[in-house]
Amino acid sequence: MKMKIIFLILILIFSINIIKCDKEFKMLTLLTAQVDDLGFNNMINQGRIEVAKGMNIEDSRLLVVEGFNETFKHLLPIVQNDDIDLVICSSSGHLQACRAIAEMYINSTTIKTQFLVRGSSSPTRNLIYISYNYASANYISGYFAALFSKTGKIGFVSPGQAANNNDSFVYAFWVGARQVNPDIKFYYYNIGNYLDVDKTVAATNDLLDMGCDVVGNTLDDFSTGDASIARGFPAIGTNGFPQRHVYGENVIYSYSYNWTKFFLPIAESVKSGNTNNSQWYADFDFDENKNFYHLDYGFEVNQSILDKMNTEIDYLKSTDRMSHPYYCNELIPQYAKENNLKLANVTGITLPIGCVTHQTFLSINKPFPGMTYLGNYKIKLVEVEFSQSLQYGFSITTGVLIAITIIMMLGIVRYKSTPSIRSASPIFLNFILAGGIIVYIGIIVWVGPANDHQCNARLWLVTLGFSTLIGSLVVKNFRIWLIFDNPELKSISITNYQLFPWVGACLVINIILMSILTSVGDLREIDAQGIDSLGKYEFMKVCKMNSSGASTLYTILAYFAALLLVGVFVSWKIRIVDIQEFNESKAIANTLYAISFCLFVIVPLMISPQDKQSETIVLCTAGLFITTAALLIIFTPKFWRVFTLGDGGTNDMFRKKQSNVATARAESSKSSSGPKLNRRGNLVSDDFTDTETSISEKKVNVVAGAVLAEFTDDTISEFDDNNIEQDNDNDNDNNNNNNNNNNNNNNNNNNNNNNNNNNNNNNNNNNNNNNNNNTNTSQPNDEKVEEKQQNDTEEEDKNQ
């Protein structure tokens, strides 16, 4: 009884050890991409899953790595720490790293990891090799492509040498097609990678455009098939995945790998502790348990094609691999001679004339006669241009505004003698308009195609235009301030020639700053990618400068801001001027305020990343708004007064006739003589009081002419000679009247002191009344004129 119990315990322990052993087997599979590529990596993963199912492996891992450095870096710690039993290095890109780690632990007693790698070298105690005849799969695929093609043109997309893959498999595809049709037209591209969707799709589309109706590939994914289906062409699956399971009848042919048939026996051998490793080989085989490839056809493939395909596959199965057509054909000898390749000479095997070994086959890279190599494919970058409609819109709008501005300049010349134009200085008005035209031209250049010259020209034009426009506005404001902010009413002469240097100084500062920007800013056109939601292979020509140029640009903006602040201050100082022809402060201030407001929008836009096309739209719109608003605000009132008032102004000082008061004084004061001076010794008329606190609107024309001359150029602002003579006569009459009144007052003073005091008081009262009348020159009314005439008459009666 005891023996039975012991026996049962031993059986239980043995069973537990077996179960424990099964659970502890660990397998790691290396991939070059994710399993959703519907290609090579997906099929490797399918083999891993089937092995885990068949052997009840709980710890079956995946690791996506590529290349020696990445593979070695991530794999070594796992091997050292996780007690992995089997590492499947699925890609040739994993080969070197896996071999290096296997070499490190080949004699280790603690790390017993086995490595399954791609290749056909001699195995070791911890290194297992597996290879599959990829050439036969490509050969039979090319055979099918030539059978199915209706145009006699087929294409191919290959990784090429850039991916450490020669074009021997491209050659195998072409050999299969040539077996069917010796005159087949064959075109192929290299894309430099096993997995590059963008290049694959673009290269496939190019091949389809050339007339190829069947396109194969040796890539890891199905991008070639996707591109063909999208264009309405049938696709073939040549990357080892059963594409028809996904795409149905859009795929007319595909072959798939069955890695389970090889991974499973290898894993079982490793689990059993076998270290006497061997080399494994996968290909077409009559033994279904060893047949690596499975072919699937669409309904469009007729029976004749199927029969030919089956016949050719049976030929490959029954023939020694070294005698297959891609190893042996009549083109090999000449090709080997031209490219220094050795012909096959295998001991114990009788080969046809003109064969190469598998190693020599793998070194085939240059195309054979009949193969058209299109080169390493480079995706053509597509330029995204600035919207043509917006270009036309801005250009046409700006052109119309330029035409209107030119008409305004002609209007300035035509109506230069009218008070509204004459009082504002026609020369400066044309400067302002010229600045506007320069800005408009800069905007047209701004929306045009970008190049180095355009990048520099647009900034030069816009900044010079604004300097001319704003500088002229500020200088005009400054002159108005100096003349009207004159409490002593001294005669101040500020000619245009005195103001030109100030406008020139504004331009010189602008030119210096722009010269610095041009010289050190490296302002040039570049092909920019990754902006404005552009596609991966789209670009836009944009202007770019370095940090020095950006700093200079900010300095230019600061200069404009300072100029605007000066203009705003001066326009505020002259807000009290009541004569409309001279009072441009409101118009200029409104212009400067509009510009300042726009700068608050422009400056943040210039210093923050924005959509380039939107940035151009905002900047050009702001430029048009600023310039057009400035010109309309300044010139619309002037031309309106020209067309409504003609040669007359809004103030009587512009009318070349005397007021009623001046006429009455001229008639009653002819006996007076001598000039009349105020307390400061300045020449004044009877309409000015001794306090000199205001300018009378109802003045004699000599004063009006004198004030006007301070604002305008002598050649265009003086009255004609006849009017000047008339004004001088009126002045003389007024002076005579004043002298006569003074003489009469003196006589009255000598006769009676009391009367004299009364008269003086009356005269003072009258003078005060006159002063009160004169202080309201900008708003004359009939009641004040009549009251002033009555006071003048009473004064003359008393003096008599």
Swiss-Prot record:
Its main location: membrane. Residues 781-791 have a biased composition (Basic and acidic residues). Gene3D superfamilies: 3.40.50.2300. The keyword Membrane applies. GO terms for biological process: G protein-coupled receptor signaling pathway; response to folic acid. The chain crosses the membrane at residues 393-413, 427-447, 464-484, 500-520, 552-572, 587-607, 617-637. It is found in: Membrane. It comes from the Eukaryota. In the N-terminal section; belongs to the BMP lipoprotein family. This is Metabotropic glutamate receptor-like protein C. It comes from Dictyostelium discoideum.
